[in-house]
Design a protein with these regions (language model features):
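Glycine/charged-rich beta-loop-alpha catalytic/anionic-binding loops adjacent to active sites
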Residues: 116-130, 236, 299-302
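Glycine-rich, mobile lid/loop segments that gate access to catalytic sites or pores
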Residues: 18-120, 165
Length: 339
C-alpha cells in the first residue's frame, strides 16, 4: 500500500474533483548505505483525482458535511480490473517515470498539486487566480529582490523554510537553529570575531514574508472595521498584539519610511479583536534570532484553497519593498536594538 496524509491547514474539500499531479523527492538505492540517491520528481500532468460523492448519495452536503481525511480524500489513479490490481502498482509507475528499478525505490516524499494553469480574472484583468499563491508569491519576491540588492555595509540573506503550515517544528523549519547557526558560520568564514558577529546579527532586521487576508466582499463582517486590506492597494504590514505576527512599532516605522521614500503602496492589517487569525514563522524565527521583525505579504482571498486570488499590482509592491530593503544602507547602532 502507499501511505498518504493531508495537512490540517488546507481546505481539503476544495481538492476534490480537480486534476492533481504529484511532485517531491524519491530516495533510491545507491552503493553507499549512508548516501542513498535523492531524485526530484514532478509528474507535469494529472495522475490522480479525488472524486466527490454525488449529491444524490449525500443529500446533506449543502448543510455542511465534515470531511473524513481517511475516507473522503483517498485519490484515484486508475480503475483496473481486480485481477490487475497490485499493491506495487504506484511503485511500478514511479520506477518507470524515473527510469530506475522498482526494487531500488527505498522511500518517497511526494505531494499532490493542482495542475490547473493560473488565469487573469476581471473585466480589466486586475486579478490573478492561481494555485499556491501562498506562499510562492513571497518566495518569488524575495528571490527577485536579493538579486537586485546593492547594500555594501552588511549581508543580505533570505531563508526559505519548509513546514510552516504544520508548525515549523522540523529540522528544516523556522523553529530549528538553522538560521542562527548559518548566519554565525557566514560571519566566521569572513574572519569576524564572536563579538563582531553578535553585534552584526543583533543589529540586523528580519522581514517575515507571508500572505495576508484581504477583505472579502461577501463577508466584510469578518474583518476589523478600520484595518482591512483590499486586493490591488499594495502589500500588507501585519500586526497582532498576541505576537502571532512578530511586528513591532519601530520595525513598522522603518518600513513605512522606506516605502514612503520609494512611493511603494502598502496597507495595514490587524485581525478583528474577537477573531483568532493565523500566524507566520516570523514570531518563531525571531525567538531564536531576536532582532527587529516585521511581518509583511500580499493580501489574498481564498487562502489555502486549491486556487487563491490576488491583485496583480500587489506583487509588484511587495517585490519593490523587499528590493528597496535590500538596497538600504543600515546605519542603526546595534547597542539600542532590543529597546
Amino acid at each position: 500500500s502507499t501511505p498518504s496524509n493531508s495537512s490540517a491547514a488546507s481546505d481539503v474539500y476544495k481538492r476534490q474533483d480537480r486534476p492533481l499531479g504529484i511532485a517531491g523527492r524519491v530516495i533510491v538505492r545507491s552503493g553507499d548505505v549512508f548516501a542513498p540517491e535523492t531524485m526530484l520528481y514532478r509528474s507535469g500532468r494529472p495522475v490522480l483525482i479525488i472524486p466527490n460523492l454525488a449529491i444524490h448519495l449525500n443529500r446533506e452536503v449543502n448543510k455542511g458535511v465534515a470531511i473524513n481525511n481517511q475516507v473522503d480524500l483517498m485519490p484515484v489513479a486508475d480503475m483496473l480490473p481486480e485481477e490487475q490490481q497490485s499493491t506495487d502498482y504506484f511503485l511500478s509507475f514511479l520506477a518507470e517515470e524515473l527510469a530506475v528499478k522498482k526494487e531500488d525505490i527505498l522511500d518517497f516524499e511526494l505531494n499532490t498539486y493542482c495542475v490547473e494553469e493560473p488565469a487573469y480574472v476581471g473585466i480589466k484583468e486586475t486579478l490573478l487566480s492561481s494555485p499556491r499563491l501562498d506562499n510562492q508569491t513571497s518566495v518569488a519576491a524575495l528571490l527577485a529582490a536579493i538579486v537586485e540588492g546593492t547594500r555594501t555595509d552588511g549581508i543580505n540573506l533570505i531563508a526559505l523554510f519548509d513546514n510552516e503550515e504544520i508548525g515549523n517544528t522540523s529540522k528544516q523549519g523556522a523553529a530549528s537553529i538553522l538560521l542562527h547557526d548559518m548566519v554565525k558560520r557566514i560571519y566566521r568564514s569572513l574572519g569576524c570575531s564572536e563579538e563582531e558577529t553578535d553585534c552584526a546579527m543583533y543589529g540586523g532586521m528580519l522581514l517575515s514574508v507571508d500572505v495576508a487576508h484581504a477583505l472579502h466582499p461577501n463577508h466584510k463582517e469578518k474583518m476589523d472595521i478600520t484595518n482591512h486590506p483590499v486586493l490591488g492597494d499594495g502589500f500588507c504590514i501585519k500586526e497582532a498584539c498576541s505576537q502571532s505576527y512578530a511586528t513591532d512599532a519601530k520595525a513598522i516605522g522603518i518600513l513605512r519610511q522606506l516605502c514612503d521614500q520609494n512611493k511603494i503602496a502598502y496597507q495595514r492589517f490587524v485581525n478583528r479583536s474577537d477573531v483568532r487569525g493565523g500566524g507566520t514563522l516570523g514570531s518563531v524565527a525571531s525567538t531564536l534570532f531576536p532582532v527587529r521583525t516585521v511581518d509583511i505579504g500580499i493580501p489574498l482571498l481564498s487562502m489555502h484553497s486549491a486556487r487563491e486570488l490576488m491583485g496583480r499590482t500587489d506583487f509588484d509592491a511587495l517585490a519593490s519593498a523587499v528590493t528597496a530593503y535590500f538596497c538600504l544602507l543600515y546605519t542603526s547602532d546595534a547597542a539600542d536594538e532590543l529597546d
